[in-house]
From Swiss-Prot:
Signal peptide (from-to): none
Organism: Staphylococcus aureus (strain NCTC 8325 / PS 47)
Domain Tyr recombinase, chain residue ranges per copy: 105-286
A molecular-function term among this protein's GO annotations: tyrosine-based site-specific recombinase activity
Keyword Signal: no
Protein's recorded name: Tyrosine recombinase XerC
Length: 298
């Protein structure tokens, strides 16, 4: 990494409020790019469009998914755009490079019975479960990102309005309501979880030492809950966000409301959940409509 790349990453962190997970992805993309430069005896400031095309081929030769390749190219395009603001002699070699089309996929989510099983795992009021349950409740009840969760302060919780104020992408604040189960888990956590009572900061979610929990720490907690839950496998923080959106739409929430709750700028981003919701609608239709199936069909 050189000083320009370090400055670029610092700008993303300070001015654009990128999460540590996203910053790590950008850093990894730059490191891989630097390795390619060294391997091909190329220089960062003389890198050309034809070199960019060769780099695209190099990425595909490593059997990466199109989504991964697209992200890596986007990282480098953004980096050169930043560099151009500092040096008028720099040309962005990635600006004309066509993004590989992203693979279409349906968001993964948990069924309601799977969520019930996860909550049952952290039902007993042990010290660890008090903290783990509040993480699970907040992520499922509000659909917030993990980067938003770890930055919640105690004063961001509004027990009168039953909701939480979070700082989303682009440093945009939004208020997200939560229900009775989530409220109760927060109250129990604040009252009985000893590490939160003795810490000298205002962060809501802490580890067993009373330190503000990290995104990595949240992922560890969620993986541990899954390991202790029979019949549930594979979890990532965004899966709970997908579950939140899917369950709301399945119960009749309109797309604009879900967009606002998730903090999406574009409605099209929220729209991907309607495909999942439509599957649920078809399932209900097939089970309920008297002429949905022929007699010999199951």
């Amino acid at each position: 990494m050189n000083h320009i790349q370090d400055a670029f990453l610092n700008t993303l962190k300070v001015e654009r409020n990128f999460s540590e997970h996203t910053l790590k992805s950008y850093q990894d993309d730059l490191i891989q790019f630097n390795q390619f430069l060294e391997q091909e005896h190329l220089e960062l400031n003389t890198f050309e469009y034809r070199d960019a095309r060769n780099y695209l081929s190099y990425l595909y030769s490593n059997h990466l998914k199109r989504t991964s390749v697209s992200r890596k190219i986007s990282t480098l395009r953004t980096f050169y755009e930043y560099w151009m603001t500092l040096d008028e002699n720099i040309i962005n070699p990635f600006v004309q490079l066509v993004h590989p089309k992203k693979e279409k996929y349906l968001p993964q989510f948990f069924y309601e019975e799977e969520m019930e099983a996860l909550f049952k795992t952290v039902e007993e009021d042990t010290s660890k479960n008090l903290r783990d349950r509040v993480i699970l409740e907040l992520l499922y009840a509000t659909g917030i990102r993990v980067s938003e969760l770890v930055n919640i302060k105690k004063q961001d919780i509004d027990f009168y309005a039953n909701g939480v104020t979070v700082l989303g992408k682009g440093s945009k604040e939004r208020f997200v309501p939560f229900g009775a189960y989530c409220r109760q888990s927060i109250e129990n956590y604040l009252e009985h979880f000893k590490p939160i009572q003795s810490c000298n900061h205002d962060f809501l979610i802490v580890n067993m030492k009373g330190e503000a929990i990290t995104e990595r720490g949240v992922r560890y907690v969620l993986n541990d809950i899954v390991k202790r839950t029979a019949g549930v496998s594979e979890i990532h923080p965004h899966k709970l966000r997908h579950t939140f959106a899917t369950h709301l739409l399945n119960q009749g929430a309109d797309l604009r409301t879900v967009q606002s709750l998730l903090g999406h700028v574009n409605l099209s981003t929220t729209g991907k959940y309607t495909h999942v919701s439509n599957q649920q609608l078809r399932k209900v239709y097939l089970n309920a409509h008297p002429r949905a199936k022929k007699e010999n069909e199951t």
